[in-house]
């Protein structure tokens, strides 16, 4: 147990942020402090954990209390937000315009001119601020051969059971992805929506326990350049506090929704202790069709993106490593990443986005020191040796079955509604309307009882629902 020197809790009248010195010419960054005592959370690590990792079937669904209404821009009149607002040096916040969203979803103004005086990413993809006192954004893995793993919009909360498709979606809500990463000794930078942390804090604790890096993705997921200065402060503050309350750590990293950022937003975030993290490759996975979330991008298009990056790396065409935008948004996005990660690992070294940029202390709590990336292209998997007893039965699916989209694996089935798409490894598009694209597949099912006997490092391939298809 520890008490971070950078997190001092005192009354609301006290200074809301404590300045730290810098030697690189950047505006002094500050470590957040909070106006009332935050209880130390239980069931969470207080320093980096390199394994073995916790694999769980269920998580506590108790929500945090004392936070703003979820998915709404928080009030700017609360005493906590005002205290943070008053701590910022507004002379160092550029006067970029507060933009509006038009009926077609575009921004107004959509550009600040060809000289781009405010480094407006949504217009020019600018990643180096036009003011010298702010650092450049992190947007790539500098070293060739690295894949910076990131997921936005988590933690993926379970869907209410009275919703259509809830049972199918909830198979892939957390802890599904975090279990998968933990089993395979993989780590990601997770950009959390504060509202999702507030409603599912146990998922954030599991992610931290399993060696992932937690970052901020705002409270309500609104484009940041469309918000007032005070609204930006409120969005970031409550997200930081939610993560701190749930896990005990205070992030130094954040990502703006849609990448929408300019130097006005960057300066406010930097003065609140956060550095901007973007990307140089985008899967567009959020736009895949899902019964609950809409979307129109064929999953095969997303497959092509992954394969294109792999081919480019194999051909020596990539000048740097890549930092890739993915989401833990629904069963489609979670299945997509589970399908591709084993393939990606054959070509790239997969690490968190912050790790590939040499950041070993991503929180203001200095007891958390993450490993230095060693520059090699090897991967390590920890697995468990078990004794198993099996009973095998063979069943044949009926003709013209239905299926549910969202899983992978040539000719396999995960027990939803039958076995179809047996000629493909990806049946998302064909199954999206619940119909198979061809004759059914005969399926052999195996019931397995397992007793753990010993644990060692080995290389195994476990076929479970993470890798099966609705095929």
Annotate the PLM regions.
Residues 198-202, 219-364:
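Catalytic domains of cell-wall/extracellular-matrix polysaccharide-remodeling enzymes
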Residues 22, 36, 378-401, 442-461:
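Extracellular mucin-like PTS domains
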Residues 320, 346-393:
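Low-complexity, Gly/Ser/Thr/Pro-rich intrinsically disordered linker/tail segments
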Residues 118, 122-125, 401-441, 465-471:
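Secreted, short cysteine-rich peptides and small extracellular cysteine-rich domains stabilized by multiple disulfide
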Residues 60, 64-223, 231, 235-252:
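Active-site beta->alpha N-cap acidic-glycine motif
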Residues 20-22, 42, 335, 400:
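N-linked glycosylation sites
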Residues 19-28, 403:
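Cleaved targeting-peptide boundary
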Residues 1-20, 464-471:
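Fungal secretory targeting signals
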